[in-house]
UniProtKB/Swiss-Prot annotation:
This is ATP-dependent RNA helicase dbp2. Keywords: ATP-binding, Cytoplasm, Helicase, Hydrolase, Nonsense-mediated mRNA decay, Nucleotide-binding, Nucleus, Ribosome biogenesis, RNA-binding, rRNA processing. Its EC number is 3.6.4.13. ATP binds at A184, E185, T186, G187, S188, G189, K190, T191. InterPro entries: DEAD/DEAH_box_helicase_dom, Helicase_ATP-bd, Helicase_C-like, P-loop_NTPase, RNA-helicase_DEAD-box_CS, RNA_helicase_DEAD_Q_motif. One of its GO terms (molecular function) is RNA helicase activity. SUPFAM superfamilies: P-loop containing nucleoside triphosphate hydrolases. A motif (DEAD box) lies at residues 294-297. Disulfide bonds: none annotated. Residues 17-42 have a biased composition (Gly residues). The gene is dbp2. It comes from Emericella nidulans (strain FGSC A4 / ATCC 38163 / CBS 112.46 / NRRL 194 / M139) (Aspergillus nidulans).
Length: 563
């Protein structure tokens, strides 16, 4: 998608960042008085609010979804299932394929001059381990990385002091043309680890001819992460006139098709929508010589493995592949061994699942019914500082909407983001949160990776996630870029099966452990999951069609302004 606000975005010869005022204009005056009348409550009439109210009986006759529910079938997103069945099998004859350049790394004299002991000490200090044959030495400054001046000047203009650990080792690895696996926590600077070598790679290739597809393909699990990667590529590729587009579901295909047909050197995509484009003949992957799989573990968690395999089958086998992941489970290892050749690997931090040590983790063992009161108590304290930002995670989209409505009616400036929201609403919510206009964002796990808001100070896990990996990723939204953060987690007896893993993570990070949590570990084995949607009866039917905004984000703020 070209930019957020639909204002032209990244066209062939113009690099407008697009979308500047796109959000606010698109939504009249933000919260202002723009919500109009609410019709007959949440379920009754549509009301005259945002473009036809909340979509008629969106919340199902009366109750929270006991009745027929709205017509809403979600906002699109990436289809699963039979995607890719229309793709032709490629027979690659490497002898007839055009040759391409992928090795650009020349070791800086300062790097060569270091003794092996100095290299080992640097790696130890950065908690870095490497594997594979002939792994290049890490660089300690931007100048040592050997980037061309047009890349270096842009990096320095951003005010970075020195490379992060993953960049120190990742840049020489990627610039050398080798296949690379990088394992590092989210927020460690891995996007630049592959973006800058990608720009060097593109500039060494022949120019695109009409009808050519991209040279660099970056696959990402979510729309949010894809847009964030696009922002980095745009920033650093500007001086080389590198064009890019972002291809993801949940938005109209028109602008994406237009960008692809004009020609782009970089395509950032979620797997489902990219396969749609390939099947429709809107682009091809014959020119791709630099492939990136970002957050590979997350893509596999989300069930994208069949699509990833189909996409890779369309790319020449002598390409360079870089795979980035926050964890290294067996499924990710299998993917690496299937698609990477003679790869070299860098790990930052422990190979065991561990949380960022700059995050204070507070776990409270409470009942389901205490959660709302506890959340309000914490928010009262958190929001004493106007600069704080709080991300609240829930287990389901329904609870995300309920809590957002509850908070707004209680006077808190909260908005929610999840997979059933239209893309433009998600973009708008994210922007309100980033700019601090709405410092409380309620989210499901779709937002737990790839949302790059650097200054989140607090995370509240209203519902505990299904596994400890997701717990670590959720709390990793705070404490980024060297800052400290706080994560507050509500843990109920329904979560007892997860207690042991959680205690392991807390102990490793030297955090206090609630005695009731320790007790649960001793007696766990029971617990299990309660009866589905519990208190409110059936799930009801999504959002209803119609209004531009879902009811939760359009709920008026109560008179008792809390912030």
């Amino acid at each position: 998608m070209s930019s957020y606000g639909g204002s032209g975005g990244y066209q062939r010869d113009s690099y407008r960042s697009g979308g500047g005022g796109g959000y606010s204009n698109g939504y009249s005056n933000g919260h202002g008085g723009g919500y109009g009348g609410r019709g007959g409550g949440y379920g009754g009439g549509g009301g005259s609010g945002y473009g036809g109210g909340y979509g008629g009986g969106g919340y199902g006759g009366g109750g929270y979804g006991r009745g027929g529910g709205g017509a809403g079938a979600g906002a699109g997103g990436d289809r699963m299932g039979n995607l890719g069945s229309g793709l032709k099998k490629q027979d690659w004859d490497l002898d007839t394929l055009p040759k391409f350049e992928k090795s650009f790394y020349k070791e800086h004299p300062d790097v060569t001059a270091r003794s092996q002991r100095e290299v080992d000490e640097f790696r130890k200090k950065c908690e870095m381990t490497v594997q594979g044959r002939d792994v290049p030495r890490p660089v300690e400054t931007f100048d040592e990385a050997g980037f061309p001046q047009y890349v270096l000047s842009e990096v320095k203009a951003q005010g970075f002091e020195k490379p992060t650990a993953i960049q120190s080792q990742g840049w020489p690895m990627a610039l050398s043309g080798r296949d690379v696996v990088g394992i590092a926590e989210t927020g460690s600077g891995k996007t630049l680890s592959y973006c800058l070598p990608a720009i060097v790679h593109i500039n060494a290739q022949p120019l695109l001819a009409p009808g050519d597809g991209p040279i660099v393909l970056i696959l990402a699990p979510t729309r949010e992460l894809a847009v964030q990667i696009q922002a980095e590529i745009s920033k650093f590729g500007k001086s080389s006139r590198i064009r890019n587009t972002c291809v993801y579901g949940g938005v109209p295909k028109g602008p994406q098709i237009r960008d692809l047909s004009r020609g782009v050197e970089v395509c950032i995509a979620t797997p489902g929508r990219l396969i749609d484009m390939l099947e429709a003949g809107r682009t091809n992957l014959r020119r791709v010589t630099y492939l990136v799989l970002d957050e590979a573990d997350r893509m596999l968690d989300m069930g994208f493995e069949p699509q990833i395999r189909k996409i890779i089958s369309q790319i020449r086998p002598d390409r360079q592949t870089c795979m980035w992941s926050a964890t290294w489970p067996k499924e990710v290892r299998q993917l690496a061994s299937d698609f990477l050749n003679n790869y070299i690997q860098v790990n930052i931090g422990s190979m065991d699942l561990s949380a960022n040590h700059r995050i204070t983790q507070i776990v409270e063992v409470i009942s389901e019914f205490e959660k709302r009161d506890r959340m309000i108590k914490h928010l009262e304290k958190i929001m004493e500082n106007r600069g704080n930002k709080c991300l609240v995670f829930t287990g389901t989209k329904r609870i995300a909407d309920e809590i957002t409505r509850f908070l707004r009616q209680d006077g808190w400036p909260a908005l929610s983001i999840h997979g059933d929201k239209q893309q433009q609403e998600r973009d708008w919510v994210l922007n309100e949160f980033k700019t601090g206009k709405s410092p409380i964002m309620v989210a499901t796990d779709v937002a737990s990776r790839g949302i790059d808001v650097r200054d989140i100070t607090h995370v509240i896990n209203y519902d505990y996630p299904n596994n400890s990996e997701d717990y670590v990723h959720r709390i990793g939204r705070t404490g980024r870029a060297g800052a400290k953060g706080t994560a507050i987690t509500f843990f109920t007896t329904d979560n007892a099966k997860q207690a042991r893993d959680l205690v392991t993570i807390l102990s490793e990070a030297k955090q206090q452990i609630d005695p009731r949590l320790a007790e649960m570990v001793r007696y766990s084995g029971g617990g299990g999951h309660g009866g589905g949607y519990g208190r409110w009866g059936g799930r009801g039917g999504g959002r209803g069609r119609g209004g531009n905004f879902t009811a939760s984000n359009a709920a008026p703020l109560g008179n008792n302004r809390r912030w």
